[in-house]
Amino acid sequence: MAGGGGVGGGAGEHAAAAYWYDACEDGASLLCGIDFAASADFDPGLIPAMDTGADDGFVAEIDRILESINAESSPAPPPPPPPPLPEPVPVAPPELPIQEKQLQVASAPVANNAVAVVGVVQRSKGVVARKEPRRESHGCAANGGGGGEWRDGKRPRLASGGVGGPRQEWRRRPMLPPPPSRGWDDRRGRRDFDRVRKHEHHRREARGFWERDRGGKMVFRSGTWEQESDREAKRARTQDGGSMEKKAEADRMGAAQREKPVAEERARQYQLEVLEQAKSRNTIAFLETGAGKTLIAVLLIKSVCDKMLKENKKMLAVFLVPKVPLVYQVLVMTAQILLNILRHSIIKMDAIHLLILDECHHAVKKHPYSLVMSEFYHTTPKEKRPAVFGMTASPVNLKGVTSQEDCAIKIRNLESKLDSVVCTIKDRKELEKHVPMPLEVVVQYDKAATLWSLHEQIKQMESTVEEAALSSSKRTKWQFMGARDAGSRDELRLVYGVSERTESDGAANLIQKLRAINYALGELGQWCAYKVAQSFLTALQNDERANYQVDVKFQESYLKKVVDLLHCQLTEGAAMKSETSDVEMQNTEKHNTNDLEEGELPDSHGEHVDEVIGAAVADGKVTPRVQALIKILLKYQHTEDFRAIIFVERVVTALVLPKVLAELPSLSFIRCASLIGHNNNQEMRACQMQDTISKFRDGRVTLLVATSVAEEGLDIRQCNVVIRFDLAKTVLAYIQSRGRARKPGSDYILMLERGNISHETFLRNARNSEETLRKEAMERTDLSHLDGTSVLSPVDTSPGSMYQVESTGAVVSLNSAVGLIHFYCSQLPSDRYSILHPEFIMQKYEKPGGSVEYSCKLQLPCNAPFEKLEGPICSSIRLAQQAVCLAACKKLHEMGAFTDTLLPDRGSGEGEKTEQNDEGEPLPGTARHREFYPEGVADILRGEWILSGRDGYQNSQFIKLYMYSVNCVNVGTSKDPFVTQLSNFAIIFGNELDAEVLSTTMDLFVARTMITKASLVFRGRIEITESQLVLLKSFHVRLMSIVLDVDVDPSTTPWDPAKAYLFVPVGAEKCTDPLREIDWTLVNNIVNTDAWNNPLQRARPDVYLGTNERTLGGDRREYGFGKLRHGTAFGQKAHPTYGIRGAIAEFDIVKASGLVPARDRGHFSDYQNQGKLFMADSCWNAKDLAGMVVTAAHSGKRFYVDCICYNMNAENSFPRKEGYLGPLEYSSYADYYKQKYGVELIYRKQPLIRARGVSYCKNLLSPRFEHSDAREGDFSENLDKTYYVYLPPELCLVHPLPGSLVRGAQRLPSIMRRVESMLLAVQLKDIIDYPVPATKILEALTAASCQETLCYERAELLGDAYLKWVVSRFLFLKYPQKHEGQLTRMRQQMVSNMVLYQYALNKTLQSYIQADRFAPSRWAAPGVLPVFDEESREYEPSIFDEESTGCELQKESYDDYADNMQEDGEIEGDSSCYRVLSSKTLADVVEALIGVYYVAGGKIAANHLMKWIGIHAELDPEEIPPPKPYDIPESIMRSINFDTLKGVLGIEFQNKGLLVEAITHASRPSSGVSCYQRLEFVGDAVLDHLITRHLFFTYTDLPPGRLTDLRAAAVNNENFARVAVKHKLHVHLRHGSSALETQIREFVKDVQEELLKPGFNSFGLGDCKAPKVLGDIVESIAGAIFLDSGYDTSVVWKVFQPLLHPMVTPETLPMHPVRELQERCQQQAEGLEYKASRAGNIATVEVFVDGVQIGVAQNPQKKMAQKLAARNALVVLKEKETATKKEDERDGEKKNGAQMFTRQTLNDICLRRQWPMPQYRCVNEGGPAHAKRFVYSVRVNTSDRGWTDECIGEPMPSVKKAKDSAAVLLLELLNRDFPDKPDGKQP
C-alpha cells in the first residue's frame, strides 16, 4: 500500500501495519500474553489483522529467572538431568504370534505424569521395531498360467469395524484347508517344489542384481537394491554436509545443553531493596546500565500476579519500551502501541493493573510516554489507575543540571509526570562489584580544515535541486518549506510509525543525500565523502523500486556529478614497510591504556600514523578526527578478546566508517560492522540488527560503529573499549554509552576537539550532573515535599483541542491528528505509480506589531470523500497543521470514512462478518468444509396408506391411489436381445404428481448403441383393498430385494410413510380400468412360491470365484480383487465365507460342494428322453428354461438362460484361456468343477446351459459408454467372448423371477431417482413462488459429481457474474462517499461463498441438492433398507512412506486422508438418509439458481430469487442519489480530445465529467477531478456480466469447463489492456507518473508487433505483461457509459461489442501454456516440476519433466517467467515427439518384429521354453501424487539353470512402464547368457 508524503513525508507501503508499531515488523505479537478479558470494554476484533510472531526467547528467559528466584526458598535444587543417551539403532524384533502382537499393542504403558500440551505432538523415542512387509500373491499360476507378481507394501484392509476399527497387524493371512487336487498328481510335492524355488529366489537375491548405470550400461551390484539405495542415500547425505546420524546426535546434545540449568542467577540485594519499595508505591528505579532493572520489573510482575491470583482477580500488566529494538529483549509493546490502543479505545487505562516503563526518562514533551500519562493516566480516577514502575539510568534526559535545585526541579517534573518517586541505592559497593566503572580517557584532535571549494559546489547543487523542485510544482515557497522544515515528518514517524517514502519526492530525497555528503566532507574528509556518494549512487542503481519512481534519472545524474567531483584515492604504502612495522609493534606492547589519561598518544604511534595517512590529512582527504580514531584503534591491536563500540551521531558516519577502516591494511585485525536503528532513512531491519549483534557476540565482528540505538536496551556483549567519536548530546547518552564498557579494566574514550569550549563545558557538566543526580535521588524518599509544587502541566481538554466519540470513547487530539490523516491517506486504494499523501498549503498573515499568524489548507487525495479543507488561523505553522487535521478527522468520521474507533473504515458495513473457526478447521464456504445433511424427500411422496396391512392396523375401506405406467422408448438399435426383452411396470403413488414431472423425459444409457427415453404416463385413479395392497407390497419387496441384493422378509420389513410408492407389473395391453392392467397372476405366483425358502434365491452371496475372468458370469470389478465385504481375501486354494449381502451370514466356512443338494442317477435316462433336465432342486422342461434366471449352487451367482446347447456336455474339453499357449489346465468341464469347486458332476451327459451373468443394478442416468459410435458389427464378437458361460444344469436352481422382469426392474431405481429429484425441484419452485420450469431448477440443484447429463456449472457461471454486477451496482449507488477499496470489501462480504452458504442453510437448500453419483446399492427403496457399497476407499500408503509410531498417529493420518479425498455425497457408513456436502457446493447452488432464474425470466426473475434467498441488493427509485455534479476546470476540459473519444466509442457523453473521471489516474495531482477507481469498480462488474451473458447464450452446448475458459480469456485485465492499445485509449489517460509512461510505451510497442502478425490474438496470453492501468481505464469507461446512459446495460454492450471484436471463440481460445503443459504431463504420466529463483529484478523459472530440465525463461514478473518457460518446454516436447514419430516410421518394421522387447516378448519366450512366468516385484514406490515413480524388478526360473539374477528397471511414472523397463533389462541378460536366442530360435 502506498503511503503519503506532503508536509510530513509519505506514508510507507506497509503503513497499515506500521500504524501499530514504530517501524516494527511484528506489531500484533506485542499484544500476545495480555489478558484483555480483564477489561469489559475491550474488543479484540478492533485490532487490524496482520502477521504476528511471538518472542519465545523472552518468555523462556523470564521463566528461567523466576525458576532461579523460586529456587532460593526450596531445600535443594534438583540435580541436573543426565545427558541424553544416543538413540539406539532400530532392531527388528522376532515375529510375534498374532495374539501376542495385539496384546503388546493393547498394553502399551502410559506415563502417569504425562502432560497434554496443546499444539504439541508427542512422539515416543523408544526402539522402533521394523515390521516385515507382507508379500501377497496375486493370481500366480501353478503351471505358468497367468504369471504374477510379488509386490511389497500392501497393507491389509480394515477390519469389519470400519473406519474406526482397529487395524490388523502385518502378518500372513492364515490359510484355510486346501481343496482337492487340481491337476498335479502330488499337490504336496508341488508345494515342496515351490518352497525350494522360493529358497533359491532368496538365495539369488542375496547374491546381487542387475541394473543400468547413468550411461545406460548394464551393471551387476552385490546385495539387494534396497541396500544399495540406502548406501547411495547415506553417501549423498555425507556429501551435503556430514552424516545425518552425527547431525542428529549434535542436535540432541544441543537440546540437552539448552535444557541444562544455567548457573543460578539470584537477585542481588540492591535489586530486592528497590523491589520492596516498588511493591508499596509507584517507583522510578534510578540505576546504571547493566544493573539489572529488567529483573526487578519481572519480580514485580510476579509479585502483583501472585496477589491478584489470591484475590481471584484477572490481571493486565503492560511493559512499555521506548524503541522497537527493546521489544525483542524485554517484551511487550512500545509506548506508541499502547497510546494508539488507548486513543482508539480498544482497551481502557482502568483495565491495566501494572504499567512498567523502561527508560522512563523519555517521558518529556510529546513523547508517547508523556502522552500516555497525560492523556490517559492522569485523567483516570486515582482508585482506577495502574501501579507504575519506571526504570532509567538517568532521570534527566538533557544536557545536564546547573545546580542541586535545578536537578530537584527536573526530577520533580519526571516524578509528577509518572506519579512516582525516584529511588536509587545508597550502598553502591555491591553495585560496583557487579557493574564496574570503566576508565574514562579524553583524546583531543585538531580542528579539520574546510574544503571551501567542494563545499560550495555541493551546496550550489542543493540550491539548484530546490529551485527545480519549486519550479516543477505549482506549490508556493511556504508549502515547500513546510514540507521540509515544519516538523511534521518527525511527528509522523513518532506518532504513527508510518515509514516515510522520501523517494516519492525525488528533490527532497536528493537534498537529504547532498546534505549527508556535505556533512561527511566536513567531518570525515573528502575520501569518506566520496565513499558516501558512491554508496548512494550504487544503492539507487540497484534499488528494485527505482523503475517505478518519478525522479530516478534526475537523482542519478546529480549523484554522478558528485562522485566525479569527490573522486580520490587513499593509499597506505608506508604502513606496510617491514622495517618499520616490526619495531612499531614491539613498541606498542610496552604501552597500556593508562598512558591515554592525559589525552595524548605515544609519539611512536603518532609517527607511524603520520606515515600512513599524514599526507591524506594534509590534503583534506581525511580529517584529524579520523586520524585520531585510527591512532586509538592501533593501540589495541594486540589486546586479547578485543571488543569495541564507536558511538557516532549521524547514520552516514556509521555507514561509512566501517568501509574506511576496512580499506586500511594496518587495521586488518579489526572486523567492523554498522549498527543503526529504525528512525532514519537508511533503516536497518530488526533481523539484520540482531544478526550484527550475534556476530559481535561470537567474535565474527569485533568493532561496532553504532548510533544511539546501541546506548540502551540492546543485549550487547560487554566491551573493553567504548569510543565516543561524536560527543554525547545529553547526560543520559553520556551515562548509557559509558555503561557499555562493563568489562573489568575497560576504557571509555571521549574524543574532544582541541580548543572547543562547548565540548569541554559539556563534559564538565555531565560529570557534575551525574553526581548531583545521584545525590538528589538518595535524598528523595517520599513525595511529601512536593505538596503544592507540582509542575505537571494540565492536559488541554478544550473543545477545539480534541474530538471524542461518545459511543466508544475513542479520541483524536491535536497531537495525533496529523499522523492519523497520513495513516488514512496510506489506506486509500493506490498502486505503485501513485503514492497518496495529504498536502498542506500554508498561508501567512502579518499583524501590526510584527507578529505572524498562519492558516493551513489541507488537500486530500482525489479518492478521498472530500478533497479540500481550510483550517483556522493559528499562532504557528505546526499548530495550523494540527488544527486542520483535527477538523478533517472529525469530518471524515461524520462522513463514515472513520469507524467509531477513529480508524479508517475498510468496508465492513454490509453483509455478514466472517466467522472465526477453530484453528486447523476449514472455513465455511470452502470446498474442504464438509458436513452431514439429511437427504430430502418430497412432501408429495408421503403417505400413511403404505402402513396398511400391519399387525393391528384395521381399515375396511378402499384405498384410493394413483397409478402411473413407465413408458420406455428406445432410440437406436441393439442386437442384444436382453436389452429389449423387458417386462412392463407401473408405479403407484398416494398423491397425484405434478404435470411437469410427467412431461419430463429421462435418458437411460442402457447400451453402447441405444438410449432409452423413459417417462411416466398417468393411467388413472385406482381403488384397492387392504389384502390387495399387502400382496402388492410383498411383490415389491421380493422384486427390490433381488434388484438391490438385500435379503429381506416382506412380513417383517419396516415401511416409512415419508416415501410411499410401489412397483407393480403390468401387461402390455391397455385397459380402461387401470387396476386390471396389473398382472395379478404373476404377482401371486411370485409372492406365494416356496423357492424363497432357499437363501441363495433371496440374495446373492459374496463369494470368491477364483479368477478374474468375466466368462464365469457376474461383475469382474466386484470380484476381481478377491475381497469380501468383511475385509477377508482368499487365495486360490482357500474357501470363502458365504455371506448374504445386506444381512448376517447364514453359512459357516464350508466347501462349495456342501451347498449342492444330493442328486440321484436313477431316472436320468427316462427324463432325458422326455426332454427334461435335472436341475439342482428339481427337473425342468428344457424348452421352459429359455429366458429364466438360474442360480449357480456352487457359487451363488445368478445367470440369464440364453439357450440349451445340446451339442455340448460336461465331458467336452475345457476351453483354453485366451493367449495361453501352455498345457491344458483342465481336461473337461467336469474336471474343472471337480478341481475348482470340489463338485463331482453326476449327469455329465446332460446338455450344458448357455447363460449370461446377471449384473448388479447400475446407474443408468450417467453416460457409461465413452464410444457411442462403436461399430455394430463388433458387438456379437465381443458378446460371445465376454458374457456367455456354459453351466451344467445339475448345479443350477431356477429362480422364481423371470429374466425379463428382473431386467425391467433394474431400470426402476434410476427412473425413480430422477422422479424424486424432479418432485423436489417442483416443491422448491412452489416455495420460491415464481414461474420457472422445474427442469431448470433441477439443473441448478444437480452437481457435476452426479455425473449426469444435468449440471449446475454453466448456470453458476452466469449467476456469479449477474450477482456480482447487481451487488456492485447497489453498493456504488448506495454509498457515493466510499472509495473503491471499501466497496470491494463490502461486495466480497455480500457475495462470498461463506455468506451464500449461510443463505442456503437458512432456506434448507441442502435438502434439495443432488450432489452424489447415484448408486442403486445405497438407494433407499420403500420397504427395502439400503446396503453399503462394497467398494473400499481405504487408505493404503506405500511402504516407502514414513512409518507411523503409534496407533493414534495411524488413525489420524487415515482421517486426514479421508477428509481430503472425500467428495460430495460420499459417506463413510451404511446410510442413505445422510450425505456429505461441502459448503462451497451450497454456495454454488445459490449462484446457479440465480443463473437459471435469469435465463428463464430475466432480471425480474433473478432479482425475485435473490430477494427470496436473502440478498437485498435493490434500491427504490427514490433512494438512488442524483448524479454527482462535476465542476471541472476549463483548462482540463480543453486538454481532452472529446471528439476523438467520441469517434472511438461511438457515443457522446451527456455528462462529460464522467468521461474525464474515467480517464484520470490517481497519480494525477488533484484538481477537482476524482480518479477512475469507483467507475472501474462498477465497470468491471458490468463488463463481466455482459461478456458472460454473451458467451452463455451464444455457445449453448459448450461444456462448463470450456465456457469458463472462454470467460477467463475474454474477461481479464491483459485482454482489456490490449483493447485499450488497439483503439488508442491509452493516449487519453491522464496520469502523473513517468514510470507508468515508460511501461505503457514499452507495452504499446509489443502489442503493435503482435497485431502485425496475421490472425494473431493472444486474448491476454501475450509475452508482455500489461500495465494494470490500461485494463482499468477500459472498465472505468464502461462504468461511465453505464452511469451516463441512466444505468442501461444495453448501451454499454452496444459500445463495447465492436471494441472487444474479435471476441474469443472455442476455435480461437488459446490455452495457457502452464495449463497445457500440466494436462499433457498428466496424460503422459510424466512428473512436472517448476523451480523458481530470483536474482535482483529478474525471476528465473525452470521446467523439469521427469527430473530433466526442458525449459527455462527469465522475466521481471515470476508469473510471466513461468508462462514463458512452460511455452519453451512445450516447444521442446513437441519437437521431441515429432522426431520420435519420424524415427518410429523409419524403424516401424523392426519395432513390429520379434526384436521389440516388451513383457509380452518375455512371456512368449517363457512359454516356448516351458519356463514359469516371470516374477515381478515392486521395489520402490514414492514421490508426490503428481510425480509418482515406480521401480520394479523381474526374474525368471530357467528350470535348467535355476533363477536368473534380479533385474531392476528404471523409475517410471506407471507400473506398466516400470515392468517393461525391468523386462527389457532381463531380455538383454538372457541374450547374453544363452548361446542360442532366448526365443528358442537357433542363431
Curated annotation (Swiss-Prot):
Give the UniProt record's GO annotations in the biological process aspect: miRNA processing; siRNA processing
Cofactor(s) needed by this chain: Mg(2+); Mn(2+)
Q: Name the source's superkingdom.
A: Eukaryota
Q: Which segments show compositional bias classed as Pro residues?
A: 75-96
Q: Which GO terms describe its cellular component?
A: cytoplasm; nucleus
Q: Where is this site: Important for activity?
A: 1668
Q: How does it assemble?
A: May interact with ARGONAUTE1 or PINHEAD through their common PAZ domains.
Query: What name appears for this protein in its UniProt entry?
Result: Endoribonuclease Dicer homolog 1
The organism is Oryza sativa subsp. japonica (Rice)
Which gene is transcribed and translated to give this protein? DCL1
